[in-house]
A protein has these predicted regions:
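Aromatic-anchored segments of alpha-helical transmembrane domains
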Residues: 15-23, 105, 126-129, 170-186, ...
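Hydrophobic alpha-helical segments of polytopic membrane proteins
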Residues: 156-171, 221-243
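Alpha-helical transmembrane segments of multi-pass integral membrane proteins
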Residues: 210, 237-345
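Membrane-cytosol interface segments of multi-pass membrane proteins
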Residues: 1-177, 289, 310-348
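Interfacial loop-to-helix transition and helix-capping segments at the boundaries
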Residues: 45-58, 129-142, 182-211, 245-268, ...
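Alpha-helical transmembrane segments in multipass membrane proteins, preferentially the mid-helix core
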Residues: 146-155, 211-225, 267-280
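Short juxtamembrane and helix-loop transition motifs at transmembrane-helix boundaries
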Residues: 81-82, 98-107, 124-132, 188-195, ...
Length: 348
């Protein structure tokens, strides 16, 4: 799977994330916030699509991270070169710090109750230990841990044969389920140690998708599937049909995030086949800005403007407005980073 395809999939995932955070809140069902169509059990389609399908975005991001770092390992680490994980994570933190520098002062003005002037709290949010400033950052610290340890994790995975792969799959699946269950038990934001423990449990929960992404690299799953589908004259139709079937199948199941485990790799695989050899500039644009949009969009939904975006009433209109303002903000942030990142990298 090439960079263009990965970028397009990231573009799809960030759009899913924005829809998720707009419509997964059951408090909006009273009809005063936005117009909606009922689906079943008295809940709107926008909610079911968000909660059941769009909530797959984070596991899918982590899958792509495992896949991408697996590719980097095979290209660089095996020849003794650095994977650049330290620089990669540092640049992500710089991006976060720029966003905090922009949005926290704005938040202190518009929503001072939510943004107290605590230096400890500021440091915790700058490192990802706390996500009090923006709950959408919850998987920042788990990602940093996975990325920084990826060289050793991937080296461990690559040394096994088929039997070892089966054992590792079952072991990491059990660890992921344990992490998912444990998050609810330790999710206490009042103590820094509990916040660290929550981040660790989130990392354990996400580790299986990270592992599966690496396994796709180890066994060339996507490349083999693309080559196999190339023998069919209607490969695009088949892969599109697979995506539609997977979406419908997921909508017919429960809300548990554990259900994403089998669906996420299949969705990514189907999208990789569907988008292979294509260059959709629209999706690539959102893929390029996906990190910034992840880090900023929730400010516009709740933390600063306190749900004012729902004044637009209609789900598609609200969604397009959030996408537009998040994208515009991302472009501004990229302009700032053009000056900030080189200066900081020179000092290191």
């Amino acid at each position: 799977m090439g960079k263009d395809t990965t970028l397009q999939i990231k573009g799809i995932l960030i759009l899913m994330m924005l829809w998720l955070h707009l419509y997964s809140n059951e408090d909006l069902f009273d009809g005063t916030c936005y117009e909606f169509l009922y689906w079943f059990n008295g809940k709107p389609f926008s909610y079911h699509f968000a909660k059941k399908f769009c909530s797959m975005c984070v596991p899918a991001y982590i899958f792509l991270s495992g896949y991408g770092l697996g590719k980097v390992y095979c290209k660089k680490a095996l020849s003794g070169q650095s994977m650049g994980n330290g620089k990669r994570c540092f640049n992500l933190y710089v991006r976060l710090w720029v966003i905090i520098a922009i949005f926290v002062p704005i938040g202190c003005y518009f929503n001072p109750e939510h943004y107290p002037y605590s230096m400890l709290e500021l440091v915790e949010n700058m490192t990802g230990i706390s996500t009090y400033y923006n709950g959408a950052w919850w998987f920042l610290l788990p990602y940093i841990i996975l990325a920084m340890s990826s060289r050793y994790f991937i080296r461990y995975i690559m040394q096994f044969g088929k039997k070892g792969d089966i054992v590792n799959t079952l072991m990491l699946l059990a660890i992921s389920v344990f992490g998912y269950v444990a998050i609810a038990k330790v999710n206490d934001s009042t103590d820094i140690l509990m916040r660290l423990l929550t981040g660790l449990m989130a990392m354990l929960y996400l580790s299986f998708m990270f592992f599966v992404g690496i396994m796709f690299v180890k066994h060339n799953v996507i490349e083999k599937a693309i080559n196999r589908m190339a023998t069919f004259s209607n490969a695009t139709r088949y892969s599109l049909a697979a995506v539609v079937v997977l979406i419908i199948g997921r909508l017919c199941m429960g809300n548990s995030a554990l259900i994403h485990i089998p669906f996420t790799p299949l969705i990514i695989l189907s999208l990789a086949i569907l988008l292979n050899g294509k260059s959709n500039k629209f999706l690539q644009l959102f893929g390029h800005h996906s990190t910034n949009m992840w880090l900023v969009h929730f400010f516009f939904i709740t933390y600063i403007f306190d749900g004012q975006i729902y004044i637009l009433r209609y789900p598609i209109v609200i969604f397009v407005a959030l996408v537009a303002i998040s994208l515009a903000t991302s472009k501004i942030i990229d302009r700032i980073l053009m000056y900030v990142q080189p200066l900081l990298n020179k000092r290191l």
